[in-house]
Amino acid sequence: MGGMATREPWSEIHRRLSARDEDRLSATDLDALADALFWLDRPLESAEMWHRAYLAHMERDERAEATMAAWRAFYEHLQIGERAVASGWLARMRDLAADAPGSLEAGYVALAEASWAHVGGDAEMALGPCREAVATGSERDDPNLTALAIETQGRLLIELGEVAQGLGLLDAAMLSVLGEDLDPLFEGWIYCELLSTCRGLADLERASEWTRAAMRWCDTLAEGRVYAGICRVHQVELDCLHGDWSRAEEGITRACADLLAVDPRYAGEAHYVAGELHRLRGEYDAAESAYRRAHELGRDPQPGLALLRLAGGQAASALAALRESSVCREGPPIHRARSLAALVAAELQGGSPERAHAAMGSLSQVTDDNESSYLRAIEAHCQGSVLAAEDRPEEAVTALRTARRLFTELGMPREIAEVGLLLGQLGQRAGDIDGARLELEAARATFARLGAAPSLATADLLLAGTAADRHGLSERELEVLDLVARGRTDREIAAELVISAHTVARHVSNIRTKLGVSTRAAATGYAYTHGLLHD
């Protein structure tokens, strides 16, 4: 096994061996043909060819080689969802390994045992054979087995709650990829598994670093689009977060086409990410199509589809989808956090701050259970939104400044600008027109550069609001003043705005102070004179 630099192209191997009569193909030829079919993105044919290679090796009593052919057939069938067939191959491997305890092949079989236990939902049971595979790979000086088994052990530990230890093992596996001459099968395997794990944990700093390495490796692939397509989806998502939407558009178009053409099982995530980019740009029809295609390909379209409904003013539809979807309760931390953040936004838009507060509690639990700056930033942003809706501006500003600091450290311009929008609104409510304008103009500039049309329109609308002379009154104070002018008592105003009578009294006092009047009647007269009342 070795790197790809001196390897004959897979298409040439396939052409050369396919041209021969079947009875002239050796067992080794069948191995090479099966491998070529894998790299040419033909998994079903590859699985069948590994079966033929296994039989050829067994006919020659080449038990070690037969075990490895069975190992490849096992994973091919496992990946395409044929678990019953995969189970049969595992049984054959067990029989062969029983005759060669401690052999290198037995180590590969142990890794297959770990994978089988893991897909069966028992990560703890998978640890034992995985550690056996690590030990065998080290003892037999096989870097491929050692690196893949270490990476698998890291993922298992993360799933079992030992995140720091698991991440350390993932980093160790990646160093093997970068520093040792691994077979490309194992390089691509480790890259894809590691990137998926880091993304799921919302460890975006680590994901960014390893994604760059993965894409450099993908650039060396002359053939085989599955590994490159999967890695490219991760790169596109990071490009979206870091504000390079032009590169993201180019990358996701290519990823969708490549994955759909060669292995649709992996194309669902690509179409979902495409939907996210379209939604953020305000290309709502294209976003809808992408989310629906993702769903057809087996990817839950939430929370993106719910956020699309929310952007269209359909809060009830968004709430129904998010409350019913399992993404708020299950799956990797990043999926749950994003879904709960969407639920918070939908509850607020739907006029249910109490429910939004409850969703915040669930989001905080996800954040507390995971060390992630990105999750903490999402939590702080949502917390600021909820506090603003609860008319607790000082606490809201504190939370939003925390969110902005974290998003800034992560290099996420759109998220920074979204926080700026809310800070600008809070500034408007407090009568800090200059401060509000600074926030809103900065946010607007970012949205214009990115091409985030919906957020740009919101910024323009809010900036128009700062231009109107509201005499220093906040939105809530204007609402209270309008009701005072209609003759409502503090208790009646409190009931209508769903706030306490004490809060109403505080607003009335602030109104009198800002307008320079001493009575409710004088405030009413001032409001009529200066056009501060609703039509």
Name what the model sees in each region.
Residues M1-A73, W89, A97, A380, ...:
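Repeat-based scaffolding regions
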Residues H14-D21, H51-D61, L90-P101, R131-D142, ...:
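Amphipathic alpha-helical segments of tetratricopeptide repeats
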Residues A389, T398, A464-S518, A522-D535:
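Helix-turn-helix DNA-binding segment
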Residues S373, S385, A389, P393-E395, ...:
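Linker/hinge segments immediately adjacent to helix-turn-helix/homeobox DNA-binding domains
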Residues G2-G3, T28-D41, T67-R83, E105-D122, ...:
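Tandem amphipathic alpha-helical repeat scaffolds
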Residues T6-W10, P43, R63, R83, ...:
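TPR-repeat structural position
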Residues L348-G351, H357, S364-R401:
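Alpha-helical adaptor scaffolds
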